[in-house]
């Protein structure tokens, strides 16, 4: 005990020396409120703002100072009148001004510990007559302290009070440092630590996608630790800090102007996050007004919903988003405060200064050239609005009272007065066993819900709940409007928010990318990017990645996904289809007409001489070639694809097999006549039909094997240069389709060779010549078709149309060169369709190397066509 006393005396000496020096330095005249009681609570409030230059204290702080001070007095009055809370115990107060400075607050707080340092043990000091020593000017013994306001003040005071085990409850200090119980083990607060607020602010930025912002913090624990917590939360959400500024304690206008100039150096950081004390916030907004700078402010509860901060600079603050601790107004305090005036409030030595400042008048005769205050002036709803932390001041006083009440009930169970065990308070026991365990419903709160419960967590912190305000101009009047709240999660009414430029501002290092662009982040920087356009066939998997939709798919309009492209193919109503189909129909009609004419005149000499069996086969092939146009225009399907593969080669094989059989027959007959050979074999109609069918069968077998090895089907085909179009095609390559015509090409070549060999037939015996014309023209068509087919491979419409027209032209060549002359004679020159001379093949005789005829005129008769029974004179038919 003696060792402790010596330590306390030593501490007193050290503090007293510094304290007396400070008094001398500042010509100090103490203002304080001292109201005696059984238990006394200390109070620290920023009644004056910090001064400028050499002055410690500045103007009266109307809201954070006077209102909060009166809130403590109001709470003390209510508790002393309460019959259930500390009945029989009167609470007193000792309230001091901090002048919004931590160093000044520390000097003031020495008054709270003087009682502990100067307390004399009565048992050790007695008078000779046995009586105890009389102690004069004994300082009030402080049971606990309510305050301070700023975190820097509370930290300094907490370091002092912990030495003397005096519990402390703050109503506004939110620095995260104060949650460290190893250093601030007698500190509690009715407000949450700043890291909750920092998290809420970061979530607001992320909500509006503000990823590149500037920050300004007040020097000291509130601003520095708050902005540090915000930066940690910002990093977790990929939010970058463009520039981080700090406002010192000098409170010089130039420093605020300098900060604004620095903020303007980052034009893309349109949002500025403020973790500042109220006076610093006011000066910064004023500096922005002087510079005519426009920012979107996101401010902590240091700004909150205070009118004094934006007074005179409302246009600069318009659109600001501010946070304020969630609280309910104490209506009973409104009535109490509005009843005060300088004539009935004598216990508050600062109230007269407050009154003069608020109403811009003087309570003395024309002091400072001001008008004399009217005695009818009053505080009312037109000039008063309850400060946002009044509830927390009241809750702090009641929390201390509830802790003392429980301690008194425990230590003094048989009395409502203070027993000896309570006269010397054990601060450690009061804090840990009672204060941290209190749990009660906030007084004067009409809502009896979970949000109205007052309690502390294991770190002595209050619960984290915030209101979000937006500074607006409605009907020409500026005001704060609550637009959301935060309690672990953010809830915002975006439609209620007003912005300075009537739209949600952007605050990003780089300009937003267009809807079809992705962000390419710059190395080492998570907030700056360049915009790279996605390819037309890519969608945005996220804002940093363009992904290929894949073949046959295309990105949606909003580029959030892909959809299957519709299959494109030639439709019957397309111009690409109408032309080929018209040509094919015309050709098919011509073919039918020729067949009709031939059938009707089937037994006439001309039809017989033409080799009618091969003619019908040839006409069937021509008709089939016209049908191919319909197969190529039709929508691809497995059946259509099979018919295409089977029909294309087969139609040509039928035509050219018939022509090859015919030209081969002519060539063999003339070779026989010229060489005097015996009658050629296999020149009868049936033989020629079988030869022709055999040639056709080869093609059918080849195509059948092809269909078996490669089953017909469809495929979705996309050209690399035309990804937006999906073509529905048969599942064969164009090259495979042409390879399948190899056999037909061989037939064409052989036909052409035979036609060339028989080109010197007698002039009046010229069917071979017409076959030659047919083959030459066919070769020209196909030589022209092949390059066009391959060159137009990128446009399936042109390619298909070219194929259809080429096939139809091949049919027209056969009809025009071979059948048109015959039809013309049959219909318009029937006199030529007769028999005048006949030469039987059995009259051939072979002698030597030549062939002779029994008639002397035989040399003037040359067979015109292959016919196993007879050869007609050319005078019968020129064909």
Swiss-Prot record:
The record's annotation in CDD domains points to: 7tmC_mGluR3, PBP1_mGluR_groupII
Q: Which residues lie on this side of the membrane: Extracellular?
A: 23-576, 635-645, 710-734, 793-802
Q: Which parts of the sequence lie on the Cytoplasmic side of the lipid bilayer?
A: 600-613, 665-688, 757-769, 829-879
- Membrane spanning stretches: 577-599, 614-634, 646-664, 689-709, 735-756, 770-792, 803-828
Q: Which GO terms describe its cellular component?
A: astrocyte projection; axon; dendritic spine; glutamatergic synapse; plasma membrane; postsynaptic density; postsynaptic membrane; presynaptic membrane
Q: In this UniProt entry, which cysteines form S-S bonds?
A: 57-99, 240-527, 361-373, 412-419, 509-528, 513-531, 534-546, 549-562
Which compartment or compartments is the protein found in? Cell membrane
Where along this sequence does the record place binding of L-glutamate?
Answer: 151, 172-174, 222, 301, 389
Q: What terms describe the molecular function in GO for this protein?
A: calcium channel regulator activity; G protein-coupled receptor activity; glutamate receptor activity; group II metabotropic glutamate receptor activity; scaffold protein binding
Tell me the domain of life. Eukaryota
The UniProt keywords, alphabetically, are:
Cell membrane, Disulfide bond, G-protein coupled receptor, Glycoprotein, Membrane, Receptor, Signal, Transducer, Transmembrane, Transmembrane helix
The reply on keyword Disulfide bond is yes
The record's family statement is:
Belongs to the G-protein coupled receptor 3 family.
Q: What is this protein called?
A: Metabotropic glutamate receptor 3
